[in-house]
Amino acid sequence: MTSLKLLKEKAPLVICITNDVVKNFTANGLVALGASPAMSEFPADLEDLLKYAGGLLINIGTLTDENWKLYQAALKIAEKYNVPVVLDPVACGAGEYRKKVADDLINNYKLAAIRGNAGEIASLVGIDVASKGVDSAGVDNIDEIALAANEKFNIPIVVTGEVDAIAVNGEVVTIHNGSAMMPKVIGTGCLLGAVVASFIGLEKGQELKSLETAMLVYNIAGEMAEKRPNGHLPGTFKVEFINALYEITDEDVKEFKRVK
């Protein structure tokens, strides 16, 4: 299984083209975990950095016409250097423009994985799910949504919710770890996209195990943070979550994982 130890040994450079709201939180989370983040947003700079990158995150949270062009340019450069790309199609079910951008990036460029909540991924495959912007209500068929997207796009899929589902090559696993505090802190989902981008390229041909490890590390760190003093308060949880990402070990993952 792809391990946290391997990530810390390789310390992959992860280029994060992400939304303005979460850049600081994302960078701190990746550093705590053991990756090396770069928040570059200029094509000439990306040309230089992606030569050495282990992953690229495209997060469409703060979407503009200019950012759409940036995503396209970054994806072309990433393909040139064979850098795995994770797409986070934030709120793509909330309106036609976001859906149009997400469809363009999925259908016309090479992606290593797509990570989104149930409402976002369901919108990509035409399944009706109650959603509001970046949030989606509890969904019972999250594994079916993941499989439908995996089959449609032939791309590894991560769907997050009260239970998380990962679908790769027609196989699906569900992750039952996590903290109810995560949705109460802005940026936890966006940071997860960057964590997925950190793990996805560690071992070629092991996408399912890499994604499973990424999700377990992230969710168990959330459980650890919530259990700490005042971890039930959003401000404290945010800080303790970064601390937990720094402290979590492969042994913690092995002991506390709940996978079906």
Swiss-Prot record:
Positions bound to ATP: 115, 160
Enzyme class, spelled out: transferase
Keyword match Repeat: no
Binding site for substrate: 39, 187
InterPro entries on file: Hyethyz_kinase, Ribokinase-like
Coiled-coil ranges per UniProt: none
Gene3D superfamilies reported in the protein's UniProt record: 3.40.1190.20
Entry cofactors: Mg(2+)
Family classification: Belongs to the Thz kinase family.
Protein name, entry field: Hydroxyethylthiazole kinase 1
Protein's organism: Streptococcus pneumoniae (strain CGSP14)
